[in-house]
Amino acid sequence: MKLLVVGSGGREHAIAKKLLASKGVDQVFVAPGNDGMTLDGLDLVNIVVSEHSRLIAFAKENEISWAFIGPDDALAAGIVDDFNSAGLRAFGPTKAAAELEWSKDFAKEIMVKYNVPTAAYGTFSDFEKAKAYIEEQGAPIVVKADGLALGKGVVVAETVEQAVEAAQEMLLDNKFGDSGARVVIEEFLDGEEFSLFAFANGDKFYIMPTAQDHKRAFDGDKGPNTGGMGAYAPVPHLPQSVVDTAVEMIVRPVLEGMVAEGRPYLGVLYVGLILTADGPKVIEFNSRFGDPETQIILPRLTSDFAQNIDDIMMGIEPYITWQKDGVTLGVVVASEGYPFDYEKGVPLPEKTDGDIITYYAGVKFSENSELLLSNGGRVYMLVTTEDSVKAGQDKIYTQLAQQDTTGLFYRNDIGSKAIRE
């Protein structure tokens, strides 16, 4: 069986590597992928994610069994619909189902309609009305661009002035273009955040281990929001009762609701949750695997990944098993200056040996193909599975201390919340 993974980051590296390790999978292509993936025997295809017709032609010419779609923008652009129309299978939601991610207002409407716990909110396209709402509600308050904004479209404002400025940047200054033409303004929720993922097909779903991401750039959750600087799974201090509540009050009603709306959901559903004094509430939905959470969840899968996905797509009950003990922890290494301006072309350390996994993201080979160089904001991620969060930290940070990370940076406290609890 030959498979195609669409995307180019660390998430797609983890997906493709796990698929290639599955029985019956002979070859995994990644479009466009990154040069670091070739070190794990993956084949790159020089087609960008927005070129649906070229991807479809490639899949047909190479007798691809099915495609796994990684990035949110491809799903929002209807790549799954296009593959299906061409008679090809793709694992991911249709454009209509993916609206759970590409419109925060739509997600809110679904949650309200199906009684899913989330923050109180208002949606605005008129700046003066947004400003009046902010002034009426007070701070802290959260301002979100309605559409996709590379994970940067959320401002947690500690003052009314900050919130008004964020709304102005989105609605009047076109900071995020069409994605910010509407804003969702939410009450601030206090509590610890965690991620819950599920494989889904219609109202059938299969929960994955819990994970905790670290969005801020710097230690102590300081600095600007990023795509994510590290993660670990499962979250050891999170009671199973909280997970069970989230499944029954959030995951199940949302997926059943999407079926009722005529938008049945196939793919990975990510639920960003916050554990408040009133129980778990939804911060956001993503219509695909998270990055970096994928890189610490998939190493815990002990069943056959390709078979699991194939079964889910076919409506067959999958046999999914997860490692029960230990913790998987990963730290992202990023270009200095990320998430703002950064240099490219920094030489990278050689791939680690042993049981530390390296997943590559923003990298490319030098002209003579002897060296990997940085080529993006988030560059690579080191992942290990150990008995505890502390053991995972020790292993990764010892390895990083031995690497030359000049021109790069990473957080030194990934997983520390689990140790403090």
From Swiss-Prot:
| Residue ranges annotated for the ATP-grasp domain, each copy included | 108-314
Has keyword Transferase? no
Q: How is the cofactor bound?
A: Binds 1 Mg(2+) or Mn(2+) ion per subunit.
Which pathway does it operate in? Purine metabolism; IMP biosynthesis via de novo pathway; N(1)-(5-phospho-D-ribosyl)glycinamide from 5-phospho-alpha-D-ribose 1-diphosphate: step 2/2
Q: Which domain of life is it from?
A: Bacteria
Which positions in this protein are listed as binding Mg(2+)? 284, 286
Which is a GO BP term held by this UniProt record? 'de novo' IMP biosynthetic process
Protein name according to UniProt: Phosphoribosylamine--glycine ligase
